[in-house]
UniProtKB/Swiss-Prot annotation:
<dbReference type="GO" id="GO:0000107">
    <property type="term" value="F:imidazoleglycerol-phosphate synthase activity"/>
</dbReference>
<comment type="function">
    <text>IGPS catalyzes the conversion of PRFAR and glutamine to IGP, AICAR and glutamate. The HisF subunit catalyzes the cyclization activity that produces IGP and AICAR from PRFAR using the ammonia provided by the HisH subunit.</text>
</comment>
<comment type="subunit">
    <text>Heterodimer of HisH and HisF.</text>
</comment>
<dbReference type="Pfam" id="PF00977">
    <property type="entry name" value="His_biosynth"/>
</dbReference>
<dbReference type="InterPro" id="IPR011060">
    <property type="entry name" value="RibuloseP-bd_barrel"/>
</dbReference>
<comment type="similarity">
    <text>Belongs to the HisA/HisF family.</text>
</comment>
<comment type="pathway">
    <text>Amino-acid biosynthesis; L-histidine biosynthesis; L-histidine from 5-phospho-alpha-D-ribose 1-diphosphate: step 5/9.</text>
</comment>
<keyword id="KW-0456">Lyase</keyword>
<dbReference type="InterPro" id="IPR013785">
    <property type="entry name" value="Aldolase_TIM"/>
</dbReference>
<dbReference type="InterPro" id="IPR050064">
    <property type="entry name" value="IGPS_HisA/HisF"/>
</dbReference>
<keyword id="KW-0963">Cytoplasm</keyword>
<dbReference type="GO" id="GO:0016829">
    <property type="term" value="F:lyase activity"/>
</dbReference>
<dbReference type="InterPro" id="IPR006062">
    <property type="entry name" value="His_biosynth"/>
</dbReference>
<dbReference type="GO" id="GO:0000105">
    <property type="term" value="P:L-histidine biosynthetic process"/>
</dbReference>
<keyword id="KW-0028">Amino-acid biosynthesis</keyword>
<dbReference type="InterPro" id="IPR004651">
    <property type="entry name" value="HisF"/>
</dbReference>
<feature type="active site">
    <location>
        <position position="11"/>
    </location>
</feature>
Length: 251
């Protein structure tokens, strides 16, 4: 069985790590480099760096910050925010990223996924899908959760897989920052219907939530921010907890 991954996420705005609730009310969560070093030493499996306002402000991710982070860590780095072309993806890779995450740009130009995958391989392309429950459906949102799209979550997940995505980062906007646990219903629905890895995101508030994301949501990886940024739990602690409950993790 493949080991389940624990992935801290650095939501970056104006050169600092921030964290909000339901994509709103951002508060400072520390220095980018300090947090990156901490997670590297904490046995995180990967690190995600998301410039959360790049697409909203129609600008590019700051490459200097990516370069600094990549130079400080020895774990895979995924970078997202404002990546809207193959050339921009190339620049991010040249500055040390192992994977790129696309969201808004992929909805606007779905074949961007294919073009990046053809150049760098599917394993280097993560499609971030931000979803919100609307009636009985889960709709996909872009621009840091500001703009609804016409896509239903499961439909879009299948489409990005067909286009060449190597992984899906599924974030529940309803659960984001609430510490109420992942939305395991939609997580399980998508995880069991695609053949690429799905990363659970949005809502982790304790170690049991991570366990539930793997067992109830069938996620391949669990992304979290608040519980790690503010030192409520450590990644080492999380992995030991999961190991004791029968989840295969890298220690």
């Amino acid at each position: 069985m493949l080991a389940k991954r624990i992935i801290p996420c650095l939501d970056v705005r104006d050169g600092r790590v921030v964290k909000g609730i339901n994509f709103e009310g951002l508060r400072d969560a520390g220095s980018i480099l300090e947090q990156a070093r901490f997670y590297n030493n904490e046995l995180a499996d990967e690190l995600v760096f998301l410039d959360i306002s790049a697409s909203l402000e129609s600008r590019k991710t700051t490459l200097e910050e990516v370069l600094k982070v990549s130079g400080e860590i020895f774990i895979p780095l995924t970078v997202g925010g404002g990546i809207n072309s193959v050339e921009r993806a190339r620049e991010v890779f040249l500055h040390g990223a192992d994977k790129v995450s696309v969201n808004t740009a992929a909805v606007n130009d779905p074949f961007l996924i294919t073009r990046i995958a053809e150049r760098y391989g599917s394993q280097a392309v993560v499609v971030a899908i931000d979803i919100k429950k609307t009636g009985e459906d889960y709709l996909v949102f872009t621009h840091s959760g500001k703009k609804p799209t016409c896509y239903e979550a499961l439909e879009w997940a299948h489409k990005v897989q067909e286009l060449g995505a190597g992984e899906i980062l599924l974030t529940s906007m309803d659960r984001d920052g609430t510490k109420e646990g992942y939305d395991n219903d939609i997580l399980a629905k998508i995880s069991t219907s695609v053949h690429i890895p799905v990363i659970a995101s949005g809502g982790a508030g304790n170690l049991e939530h991570l366990y539930d994301g793997f067992t109830k949501g069938h996620a391949d990886a669990a992304l979290a921010a608040s519980i790690f940024h503010f030192r409520q739990h450590s990644i080492r602690e999380a992995k030991e907890y999961l190991r004791q409950r029968g989840i295969t993790v890298r220690i």
